[in-house]
């Protein structure tokens, strides 16, 4: 088992990574919390697979357990479902000393974390991510939120978990498309800060190669995410590097109303398009885009889109990195090295090119 400490002063916590970790989560939580009751927030798909198992694991450690399942999918990440979860916590008569556990991918993780931050002005919460995207990205860093009609993650908070438990065995039930979806974020980490991780992806040729290296990919990704979170907990500076590919990716998601493309697929297209254009503009080392696209295609991830750039740009202007008439783009200089580039919003068309 590997352990990564996220050093945030009084908000510090540990991320544990290891196969079979789920079976010992009850004992670990007993050491980390004084809770008598634990609410498990998950979705209906994960509940069917792991609901009874997590209930028995936590009951075996002496906790009173309630499993709260929301409908699977991004459409559930809204204020109505958020309110339903809060009412369920109140109905379970939870006190401020009790705890919430998210057993899920990103949607219940984000929504459940925001519920933990909000219920009685904050109760302890822990994360057990069940998708590769959640294991390497959304479960690390304390961003919790729900979507509004106007856009993704517009209502939320920074609220760190008390612990994260990553069990790669939980990925065995994940459809291949969603494994690759999550790995887009791992490729991103390679592009912005870990050249060796990127080269590891270049060396992977088969499904067996990927399975053999998945723990290393998870660990290196978590270390990269942790580094940026420790430097910039509240996302005002270097942590924005983690948004490589996301300005275009989020625009694609908004354009298609969060259907058609997964988050990781949108990010893959965003990285590919921005890298190609920044290479043409002289910001990115020659050849990087070809290498990036080769890795993305190996993972069956898209690298282009048949939508005119002028239709994506209005959606890109909703990006959280926009400040007034300026937007910050994350530009890869070379494999493993990126920087933030401030671009006037009227010049965004020079950077978002889909042809």
Label each residue range with its predicted role.
Residues 199-310:
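Active-site segments that bind and position negatively charged phosphate/pyrophosphate groups
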Residues 18, 40, 78, 129, ...:
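Residue-level signal for inorganic ion chemistry
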Residues 7, 93-95, 118-119, 147-148, ...:
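Solvent-exposed alpha-helices and their adjacent loops that cap or buttress functional pockets
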Residues 2, 184-186, 283-355:
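C-terminal charged capping/lid subdomain of soluble metabolic enzymes
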Residues 107-114, 135, 251:
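Short glycine/serine/threonine-rich phosphate/pyrophosphate-binding segments
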Residues 16, 114-206:
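A glycine/threonine-rich phosphate-anchoring loop and its flanking beta-alpha core
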Residues 1-99:
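ATP/NTP phosphate-donor binding region
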Residues 86-100, 112-127:
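Non-catalytic interfacial helical region
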């Amino acid at each position: 088992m590997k352990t990564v400490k996220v050093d945030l002063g009084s908000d510090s916590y540990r991320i544990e990574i290891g196969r079979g970790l789920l079976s010992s989560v009850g004992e670990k939580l007993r050491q980390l919390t004084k809770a008598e009751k634990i609410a498990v927030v998950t979705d209906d798909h994960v509940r069917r697979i792991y609901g009874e198992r997590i209930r028995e694991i936590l009951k075996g450690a002496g906790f009173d357990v309630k499993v709260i399942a929301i409908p699977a999918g991004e459409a559930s990440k809204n204020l109505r479902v958020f309110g339903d979860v809060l009412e369920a916590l109140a109905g379970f008569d939870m006190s401020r000393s009790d705890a919430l556990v998210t057993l899920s991918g990103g949607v219940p993780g984000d929504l459940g974390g925001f519920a933990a931050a909000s219920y009685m002005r904050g109760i302890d919460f822990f994360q057990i991510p069940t998708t590769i995207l959640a294991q390497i990205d959304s479960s690390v860093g304390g961003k919790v939120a729900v979507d509004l009609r106007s856009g993704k993650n517009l209502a939320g908070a920074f609220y760190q978990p008390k612990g994260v438990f990553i069990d790669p065995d939980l990925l065995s039930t994940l459809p291949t498309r969603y494994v690759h979806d999550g790995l887009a974020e791992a490729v991103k980490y390679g592009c912005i800060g870990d050249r060796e991780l990127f080269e590891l992806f270049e060396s992977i040729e088969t499904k067996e190669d990927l399975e053999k290296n998945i723990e290393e990919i998870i660990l290196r990704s978590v270390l990269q995410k942790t580094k940026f979170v420790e430097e910039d907990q509240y996302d005002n500076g270097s942590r924005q590097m983690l948004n490589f590919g996301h300005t275009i990716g989020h625009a694609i998601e908004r354009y298609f109303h969060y259907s058609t493309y997964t988050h990781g697929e949108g990010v893959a297209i965003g990285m590919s398009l921005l890298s190609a254009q920044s290479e043409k503009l002289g910001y990115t080392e020659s050849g990087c885009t070809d290498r990036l696209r080769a890795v993305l295609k190996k993972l069956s991830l898209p690298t282009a889109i048949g939508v005119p750039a002028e239709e994506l740009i209005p959606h890109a202007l909703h990006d959280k990195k926009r400040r007034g008439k300026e937007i910050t783009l994350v530009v890869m200089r070379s494999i493993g090295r990126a920087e933030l580039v401030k671009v006037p919003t009227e010049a965004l068309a020079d950077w978002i090119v889909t042809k």
